[in-house]
A protein has these predicted regions:
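Alpha-helical transmembrane signal-anchor/signal-peptide segments
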Residues: 58-80
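Short hydrophobic beta-strand that contains or immediately precedes a catalytic carboxylate
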Residues: 85-88, 363
Length: 384
């Protein structure tokens, strides 16, 4: 009896033992794979995002960039009608008249229907991107593509860097061209250093800072930022109504062949005439100095390959101008290209008469008509 009382007393002192207290509580295992799984999930997300952007980019039409977008849309509808295209800057847009080009060839019993796809201020890398978009449009009859030969412009003026036009051409291929240009700038600095002209840190940083300035528009273009409005238009407007609103054809000229007059005064004022005369006499005394660089060379080669791959023949040309320096490819590349140089005032004196110029690098309407006839005549002789 005493034994039972003592046992009961000990149990009361220890308290009641529940099943949960009688078993050890398992500790959670350390989650060593969290960082790896996060990385994998992040990569999957980026991959899906990139694929979605790529599919959407192919689904969306050419951006509605002034002049460029309109010419692309017009070629989408009428590209099969043309056998000859002209591409380049204002020295194409305002200086080559397809109507006169075709008439000059017709007088020599050669059929031609040409279109001026030039755009004000267009230079590589933008020129190559735009050319590739032109060549993606229907072009069953296309045989010849005239391309203005000019250098790559990497240092874009700040006044243009915030525009939609600046952003639209920044794809991976163009970023590659800009990187080639950057490497060329560094190589030039190393060459100068080897010749006793050491470069500063600021000079070495500048090419990279220029390239980095092109990264934001590349990213905006890659994710199709700001282009959802087109998809909204598709849901709200019928195809005919959408075409009616977008296709005004204001940039195509009265003949809808892509040529328009520049709108500048047709005659130089006294100050401009004096400046032109000075540059003209300098070119008579000494021809323009040719230069080339890796970025411009790569851009020219890419355009050469793009046109050749499309089944057409590229003809590069240098317009009539009195600039001190003119881009011209190195001999190895130039040997694979057709290049017509109209920048020599001794060979083409009529193209350099002051009455035919707006300024040292642009012709007026009369000069443009003359240049178009000379271009067509040379083409007629070449294509015999």
């Amino acid at each position: 009896m005493n034994f039972d009382c003592q046992a009961e007393h000990r149990l009361n002192q220890q308290g009641t033992v529940t099943p949960s207290e009688s078993l050890p509580v398992p500790r959670p295992l350390p989650r060593h794979g969290n960082g790896f799984r996060t990385l994998i999930n992040g990569l999957i997300f980026l991959g899906v995002l990139a694929l979605s952007c790529l599919v959407l980019n192919r689904r969306l039409p050419y951006p509605d960039i002034p002049t460029a977008g309109e010419k692309i849309r017009y070629l989408t509808l009428h590209g099969r009608e043309y056998d000859t295209l002209f591409t380049g800057s204002s020295r194409v847009n305002f200086q080559i008249l397809p109507s006169i080009f075709d008439q000059t060839l017709a007088a020599q019993h050669k059929r031609s229907k040409s279109f001026n796809a030039g755009i004000l201020g267009m230079r590589p890398p933008e020129q190559g991107f735009y050319l590739e978009q032109v060549l993606r449009q229907p072009h069953d009859r296309l045989r010849w593509v005239f391309i203005e030969l000019t250098s790559l412009e990497a240092r874009t003026p700040k006044s243009r860097t915030g525009s939609a036009r600046f952003a639209y051409w920044h794809d991976a291929a163009r970023m590659g061209l800009l990187w080639t240009w950057c490497q060329g700038e560094w190589a030039a600095l190393r060459t100068a250093s080897g010749a006793g002209q050491p470069s500063s840190m600021e000079e070495r940083w500048e090419p990279l800072s220029v390239w980095l300035g092109h990264v934001p528009p590349f990213l905006r273009r890659s994710v199709n930022l700001g282009r959802a409005s087109y998809l909204a238009e598709q849901w709200v407007l019928s195809a005919p109504e959408r075409a009616k609103q977008r296709n005004k054809w204001r940039a195509l000229g009265k003949d809808r062949d892509g040529w328009m007059p520049s709108g500048s005064p047709e005659v130089m004022n006294a100050q401009d005439r004096a400046a032109y005369q000075e540059s003209y006499e300098a070119r008579l005394a000494q021809p323009a100095r040719h230069f080339h660089d890796p970025g411009s060379d790569a851009a020219a080669q890419a355009m050469l390959e793009a046109v050749t791959h499309s089944g057409a023949t590229p003809i590069f040309f240098v317009p009539p101008m009195t600039s001190e320096k003119i881009y011209y490819p190195p001999a190895e590349l130039a040997g694979r290209m057709i290049i017509w140089d109209f920048s020599d005032p001794r060979r083409y004196p009529e193209l350099f008469e002051a009455r035919n110029h707006l300024d040292p690098i642009h012709l007026n309407t009369a000069g443009s008509e003359l240049f178009t006839r000379i271009l067509a005549q040379q083409f007629a002789e070449f294509s015999q």
